[in-house]
């Protein structure tokens, strides 16, 4: 975002400034936090800003894709679900992450700015000044990578620090570099968790860019049992699980194509797919006529949301390698989830399609579906032109456009969008 926008949102959303505001009327200058003594606080702020943006990213991505349907009565929310967001829409560009209509561009840009700023400071300090500096640096860099994953996957284009307009692939290339830098720091710190997270993030960035060989190599470095979550807290609106908040306020419901999914058994029967179990509430959404179906994945406001996992890494390997490797991975992941591992095929297309389907189930409401539809050119459901339940027709958007608030305030971006 341009400076004028960032400065305003930084005060509203950024946890560093939130900490400063509670100390009023002392009016402590933000520069006072540029001290090695505050290194851990600064990195924690980086994590907090990411988690704010990540929750909104997952919820909005669910609406933009085919995971969630809007069942509310707030018209400003409908463009997400209808896939016709306009660049002049203020909701997606400047709203906070905890708004009824969650904003994404500003919260994610704020998180990215915080991570980059903190990482830059950590690079100037020494190990003597900051105990565990390499570990803190690794975390800041890895989160900076995931901030760019969100920008690159959800937006058609974006800008970094008042720079030029970047394509999704250019933003994702930056994400890959941040993960590489974070990996080096994590290895220097001898931190196996952050090392695995860096490999996981880089595998995703490489997959997003179409580098299957590189994604495959990185995904193989993610150990069994690995999972890294974004935390949530029901006592804070900013930290409440954003998908749960949508369900709880009766604003969003699971879409029909993800209701009642099953997995085949070896005997020809089926069992419910517990990875994507949904629950009928017996209520309607806020619109008073659409049934409210919620995901059992997020039944409380403090339910964590996975950022990266062994399961995601395995599915990247399956997509990259295909064949019997993919078949084995599909069955192993099903068995690990307590489901039958009965999938068999030697047809490359059938195997690829099953991997895509497994991703939609295993990674349901984790923020991966919208970009999967885009990068794999999957059919949009409902199709463009179909009547939308709140009026109008479904559009063709697979990503959110660069908002006017960025284009009009950034001197390095063409104002015509050409």
Model-derived features with residue positions:
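Membrane-proximal, proline-rich intrinsically disordered regions
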Residues: 13-65, 381-418
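Conserved, well-structured interaction surfaces
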Residues: 40, 46, 77-154, 181-189, ...
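Hydrophobic-face positions in mid-chain alpha helices that act as interaction patches
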Residues: 84, 176, 210-211, 216-311, ...
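"A position-specific structural signal for the A-helix of alpha-solenoid helical repeats
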Residues: 136, 143, 150, 194, ...
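Short coil/turn linking the two alpha-helices of tandem helical-hairpin repeats
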Residues: 150-160, 208-212, 325
């Amino acid at each position: 975002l341009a400076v004028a926008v960032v400065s305003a949102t930084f005060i509203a959303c950024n946890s560093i400034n939130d900490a400063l505001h509670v100390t009023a009327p002392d009016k402590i200058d933000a520069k006072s936090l540029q001290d090695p003594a505050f290194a851990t606080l600064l990195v924690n702020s980086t994590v907090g800003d990411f988690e704010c943006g990540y929750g909104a990213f997952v919820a909005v991505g669910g609406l933009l894709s085919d995971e969630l349907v809007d069942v509310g009565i707030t018209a400003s929310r409908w463009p997400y679900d209808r896939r016709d967001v306009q660049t002049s829409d203020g909701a997606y560009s400047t709203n906070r992450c905890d708004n009824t209509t969650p904003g994404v561009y500003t919260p994610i840009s704020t998180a990215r700015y915080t991570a980059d700023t903190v990482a830059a400071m950590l690079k100037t300090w020494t190990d003597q000044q900051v105990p565990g500096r390499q570990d803190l640096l690794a975390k800041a860099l890895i989160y900076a990578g995931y901030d760019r994953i969100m920008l690159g996957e959800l937006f058609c284009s974006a800008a970094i620090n008042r720079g030029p307009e970047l394509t999704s692939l250019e933003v994702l290339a930056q994400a890959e570099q941040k993960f590489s830098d974070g990996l080096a720091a994590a290895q220097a710190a001898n931190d196996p968790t952050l090392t695995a997270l860096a490999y996981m993030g880089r595998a995703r960035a490489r997959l997003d860019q179409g580098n299957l060989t590189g994604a495959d190599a990185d995904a193989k470095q993610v150990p069994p049992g690995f999972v890294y979550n974004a935390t949530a807290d029901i006592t804070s609106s900013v930290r409440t699980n954003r998908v749960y908040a949508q369900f709880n306020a009766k604003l969003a419901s699971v879409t029909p194509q993800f209701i009642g999914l099953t997995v085949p058994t070896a005997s020809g029967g089926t069992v419910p797919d517990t990875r994507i179990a949904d629950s009928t509430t017996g209520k309607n959404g806020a619109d008073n006529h659409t049934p409210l179906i919620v995901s059992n994945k997020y039944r409380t406001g403090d339910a964590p949301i996975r950022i990266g996992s062994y399961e995601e890494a395995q599915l990247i390997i399956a997509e990259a390698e295909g064949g019997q490797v993919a078949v084995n991975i599909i069955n192993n992941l099903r068995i690990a989830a307590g489901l039958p591992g009965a999938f068999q095929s030697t047809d490359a297309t059938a195997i690829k399609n099953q991997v895509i389907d497994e991703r939609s189930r295993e990674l349901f409401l984790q923020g991966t579906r919208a970009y999967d539809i885009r990068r794999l050119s999957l059919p949009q459901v409902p199709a463009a032109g179909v009547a939308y339940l709140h009026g109008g027709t479904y559009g063709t958007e697979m990503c959110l456009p660069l908002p006017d608030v960025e284009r009009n305030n950034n001197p390095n971006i063409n104002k015509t969008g050409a």
